[in-house]
Amino acid sequence: MSARVTAGSRPANIATGIPVLDHLLTLLARSGRFELALELPPADAEAEVADAGRALGDAFAPLLRADGAYGHGSAFMPADEALAQVALEISSRPLVASNVDLTEARAGGLRSDLAARFLEAFADSAGLTLHVRLIDGEDSRHVLEAIFKALGAALAQASREA
């Protein structure tokens, strides 16, 4: 398993084995203007999603804690009819607080509650308090796209120099 994150705008190089997760992480990288590389060994979807969250959390942690980095950020992002807000802050008590319930939804074959598992593993590994709010949206794929785009933009704010 390998993950690398740097500021920049090269295309993301992501291979999780789960196409919809690859797509969501590509949106995160694009909206945050990060150069993102992630490769995971094959496993079941639940393990791959958690591994991806942990690996990216570990990769983002140094950027978020660098001298002069803001350490907090927030963003609203749309995806078609969906609108999501993500706010985050470096924390010694990582957690995810969300009003999004997609436990029954599927997006591209991915159980959407696996996206919640990704966010929890990511926040824990990066050491973040992460708040996710769905403002509007019906289509589960668009909701997930809006969330991951907002996460990328909020991470960009948090990792940039103050």
Protein language model regions, located:
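Structural preference for solvent-exposed beta-strand-turn elements
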Residues: 1-162
